[in-house]
């Protein structure tokens, strides 16, 4: 299974080509939120470490490495080299389930031991991981609860990404279209397999994209448990705070917490501080914020995910105080995302027009992810001429060796 149709016998892009693509992204975005190095398998590129170093010299918040983890499970030197940049690198690790039969069907090998070894090796190096599962009906839809438990138990796993199978590239099986897994299926399965600890109300669309493309749930880690932020945050009324990104630095976390508290009248006259978060919005306050009210009304049905011996309003105060103190980072959160990619059978121009995930090509083109996979990757449609002069200039200039 590979939407990129990767296979033996193909060639790597040169170091110079990859650098041109990175420069194109920076020129277009200024300070990109995330750059993902993908493939094929990027860790097999002969210049992989040079490419990573080049990317990290650019004004990019985070660099993700999209990998099957096989090399990382065995190559400590490579893990150590990546770990030098652990504050700006995240491993986007292919992890389709917690049973070997799943890997045998989807990947042609029994890879569970290899994957678990990679997870432990990366955790020992203090590298953050997002587990990425491709979901196929009849194969691994029963694995979501196991993956959630795996992620919840290891604080260096900062994300769980669920991706229903896309019928393009090296996974073209139209006879299985009737059993396609959808984003609502994923939400239902997560709720069922977490024994109701997650609820449908814990999920909301990622604002930067079309609502049918990305669904998100953010969970706060507290005393070994996960607490969805929706238990004490009014996400529906504040989605615009997440409008331009998905990955947040501690500085950005502080800024967002202050904005949220200010909107909900939780701050003092001089703005939001740690004391304001604790005092103005504490459980002892006679005038509670909307966040606290939401926390109290949902806690009764929250299940064992929520710490039951702690006042939910106090839990909200704790979270916001830590965020303002810049103590909320990747290891204090778990990000659950559901991404529904497009193929020829469900292609939707409206979704493509709202896409916030793009392929960046050495030619200077920046193309919506699914449009590239469906239309341009295999040459079904020729790439359009470049019209932006800055991008055109970057695409044609030489890169230093």
Where are the regions that the model predicts?
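Canonical Radical SAM [4Fe-4S] cluster-binding loop centered on the CxxxCxxC motif
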Residues: 1-16
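C-terminal target-recognition/interaction regions appended to catalytic cores
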Residues: 315-401
């Amino acid at each position: 299974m590979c939407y990129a149709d990767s296979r033996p016998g193909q060639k790597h892009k040169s170091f110079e080509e990859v650098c041109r693509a990175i420069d194109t992204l920076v020129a277009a975005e200024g300070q990109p939120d995330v750059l993902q190095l993908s493939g094929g398998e990027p860790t097999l590129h002969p210049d992989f470490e040079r490419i990573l170093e080049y990317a990290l010299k650019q004004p990019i918040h985070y660099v993700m490495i999209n990998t099957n983890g096989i090399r990382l499970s065995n190559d400590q030197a490579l893990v150590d080299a990546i770990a030098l940049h652990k504050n700006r690198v995240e491993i986007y690790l292919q992890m389709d389930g917690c049973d070997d039969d799943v890997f045998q069907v989807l990947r042609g090998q029994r890879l569970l031991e290899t994957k678990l070894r990679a997870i432990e090796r990366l955790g020992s190096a203090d590298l953050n991981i997002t587990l990425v599962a491709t979901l196929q009906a009849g194969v691994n839809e029963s694995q979501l609860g196991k993956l959630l438990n795996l992620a919840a138990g290891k604080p260096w796993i900062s994300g769980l990404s669920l991706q229903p199978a896309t019928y393009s590239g090296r996974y073209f099986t139209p006879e299985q279209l009737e059993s396609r897994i959808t984003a609502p299926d994923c939400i239902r399965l997560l709720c069922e397999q977490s024994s109701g600890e997650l609820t449908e109300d814990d999920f909301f669309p990622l604002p930067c994209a079309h609502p049918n493309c990305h669904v998100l749930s953010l969970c706060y880690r507290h005393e070994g448990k996960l607490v969805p932020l929706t238990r004490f945050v009014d996400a529906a009324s504040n989605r615009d705070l997440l409008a331009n990104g998905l990955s947040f630095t501690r500085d950005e976390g502080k800024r967002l917490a202050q904005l949220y508290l200010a909107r909900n009248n939780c701050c003092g006259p001089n703005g939001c501080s740690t004391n304001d978060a604790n005092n103005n919005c504490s459980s002892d306050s006679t005038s509670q914020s909307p966040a606290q009210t939401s926390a109290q009304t949902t806690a009764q049905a929250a299940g064992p995910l929520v710490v039951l011996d702690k006042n939910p309003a106090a839990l909200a105060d704790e979270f916001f105080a830590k965020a303002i103190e810049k103590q909320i980072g990747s290891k204090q959160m778990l990000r659950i995302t559901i991404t529904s990619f497009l193929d020829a059978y469900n292609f939707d121009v409206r979704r493509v027009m709202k896409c916030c995930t793009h392929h960046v090509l050495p030619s200077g083109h920046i193309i919506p992810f699914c449009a590239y996979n469906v239309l341009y990757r295999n040459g079904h449609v020729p790439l359009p001429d470049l019209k932006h002069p800055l991008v055109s200039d970057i695409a044609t200039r030489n890169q230093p060796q």
